Design a protein with these regions (language model features):
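A charged, solvent-exposed segment within the mature domains of Sec-exported extracytoplasmic proteins
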Residues: 129-196
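Sec-dependent N-terminal signal peptides
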Residues: 19-29
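Bacterial N-terminal signal peptides that target proteins for export
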Residues: 8-21
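Boundary at the C-terminal end of the N-terminal hydrophobic targeting segment
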Residues: 31-37
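Acidic, serine/threonine-rich low-complexity disordered tracts
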Residues: 37-137, 179-284
């Protein structure tokens, strides 16, 4: 038992929320970048809510360790109409014994999904930090004003500008849901420039193919598109997440497999409401 607890501590410390949230949000990100940062929204509407259960695995034992919920509602930003999207991830009592996880992400985008603002407040273990991004688009470029509040209270400011569109973990989720996955080819790689308050990731998606997924503990089955999220670091490519999204116009993630040094983690869709389109990927 002591050995299992030690291993579990290693896993939970390794499993930063960055991986969990990246997995949850990247599960819909199969879009290419372009100078046009907006896109017509056909995938979701105000009042959509998605719910997930989170699991860790060690020694072939799966344990539920938390939940995640995401909501999108109509709002205003700087006096203009916008979508307000939030993601809340919470560890349960089992996880709290080893690693506290309390995280909230907030995003504002225009009605055509152009990113305006992003904030992440993360309590991971004993460390709390905040990331903020403000977007503007001078002369057709994408300008980022970046702010990090470190766990020791230090404020770090930075500004960056790119010719291509840059996204955060929330806005890429919303944009990607509106792309036509039928145009993708098996094995195709799609660059994914995603920024936080400090770094721009060198990452991409690989389209794996189609599979049918049966939800654990139920009779629900979904036709899914399968993708891998890959990041290049220290000269090597690392598959961080493999995910399954509904093969319909909603493009909702129903399963995520996250690969860790000391084990693995999974997220499963628990429920949903307020979706815009019929869930035609669901098999009876």
């Amino acid at each position: 038992m002591d050995k299992l607890i030690t291993d579990f501590k290693k896993i939970t410390k390794e499993m930063k929320l960055k991986t969990l949230l990246t997995g949850l949000l990247m599960s819909l990100a199969f879009a290419t970048t372009s100078a046009q940062c907006g896109i017509e929204n056909k995938a979701f509407k105000s009042g959509e809510f998605l719910y997930y259960d989170l699991f860790f695995n060690w020694k072939f034992i799966w344990v539920k360790v938390g939940t995640a919920s995401m909501s999108t509602v109509s709002s205003t930003y700087d006096g203009k109409s916008a979508f307000r999207t939030s993601l809340i991830t919470r560890g349960n009592n089992k996880l709290d014994k080893f690693f506290v996880m309390r995280d909230t992400l907030l995003s504002y985008c225009t009605d055509n999904i152009t990113p305006l603002y992003f904030r992440k407040g993360a309590l991971e273990g004993k460390r709390y930090y905040v990331d903020e991004l403000w977007y503007s688009y001078p002369k057709g470029n994408c300008h980022l004003r970046q702010h990090r509040i470190e766990h020791d209270g230090r404020h770090v400011w930075k500004e960056s500008e790119y010719q291509d569109c840059i996204y955060d973990m929330m806005s890429i989720f919303l944009r990607a849901r509106n792309f036509d996955a039928s145009k993708l080819k098996k094995g195709q790689n799609i660059p994914m420039p995603i920024s936080d308050a400090k770094h721009l990731s060198n990452s991409w998606l690989k389209y794996v193919g189609k599979e049918t997924f049966k939800v654990e503990g139920s009779n629900e089955k979904f036709r899914c598109l399968v993708f891998s999220f890959i990041e290049r670091e220290d000269g090597k490519n690392h598959e961080l997440i493999r995910f399954y999204i509904t093969d319909d116009t909603n493009h909702i993630p129903v399963r995520l497999d996250m690969f860790l040094s000391f084990g693995s983690a999974k997220a499963f869709l628990k429920g949903y409401k307020g979706i815009r389109n019929p869930m035609t990927s669901k098999l009876k």
